[in-house]
Design a protein with these regions (language model features):
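Active-site beta-strand termini and strand-to-loop segments that position acidic
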Residues: 23-27, 93-96, 106
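Core segments of cupin and vicinal oxygen chelate
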Residues: 1-30
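Vicinal oxygen chelate
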Residues: 50-97
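Conserved, structured core segments of small domains
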Residues: 31-35
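A short acidic/small-residue loop/turn micro-motif
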Residues: 82-83, 106-108
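Short, solvent-exposed beta-strand edge segments and adjacent coil->beta transition regions
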Residues: 44-48
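Short, charge-rich, low-complexity interaction segments located
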Residues: 38-42
Length: 108
């Protein structure tokens, strides 16, 4: 799922390390892991994981790849939203495990 989703943002495929997978870019690291406490994994309540998109088109491709690989759309459809942070193009998904994700492009 995440290889297909993050590939639309030009992120290389993840590297598996024991019970984790890492996605590395020049600006950060995203990792998915089995819980180290042995308890079941659960989606964040009120949390959103965000990824930068280079353009609205890239955010749309990210959203489409997510849907094609088992995600569900949430929030409003992808599009422009204005608020205190300025004008943003946002696309929201829930991954197959229910985690809320967002691709964001800041419009100049």
């Amino acid at each position: 799922f995440y290889d297909a989703l993050l590939g639309t943002l030009d992120v290389p495929p993840g590297r598996v390390d024991r019970h984790r997978i890492f996605y590395r870019t020049k600006t950060g690291v995203f990792s998915v892991s089995k819980p180290i406490d042995g308890k079941p994994a659960t989606p964040a309540n009120g949390g959103t994981i965000g990824f930068a998109a280079a353009s609205p088109e890239q955010a749309d491709a990210w959203h489409a790849a997510g849907i094609a690989n088992g995600a569900t759309s949430c929030e409003d459809p992808p599009g422009v939203r204005e608020g205190p942070a300025g004008k943003l193009y946002l696309a929201y998904l829930r991954d197959p495990d229910g985690n809320k994700l967002c691709a964001m492009h800041r419009i100049a």
